[in-house]
Amino acid sequence: MKTFKLIPFLLLLLTVAMPASAQKKTQKTYIPWNNGKLMVSEEGRYLKHENGTPFFWLGETGWLLPQRLNRDEAEYYLEQCKQRGYNVIQVQTLNNVPSINTYGQYSMTDGYNFKNINQKGVYGYWDHMDYIIRTAARKGLYIGMSVSGAVL
């Protein structure tokens, strides 16, 4: 009779202990470009890596990511995309001309003259774009860029 009382207790203990031990394991980030550059297959029908590993483009569309999200929000958004299994995040570099990001920085500070696009001492529009790309890379995500959503 004592054995029958012990079994539910042990099952309860296992039920509580199993998720706790699973949470301690950290998942290693899969870095797809370790397989080489992306290229079109010889048949011209699909994408693959340089070493022949197939690549399936599973994209999330975050068109306004560079304009609307700050660094913390971008980090969170990209982490959520990674957790959901996306491997490409599609963004617009310029939603309109000029584009303005959440920090109030303009994409084209000097019109179409890009020689001085990075202003010294300012976290500019393109610095934020670089941050997004680096953050995505750390998470094993590609960034698919569209130049513009509006007519330039």
Briefly describe each language-model feature range.
Residues 1-24:
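Bacterial Sec-dependent N-terminal signal peptides
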Residues 27-152:
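Active-site mouth of glycoside hydrolases
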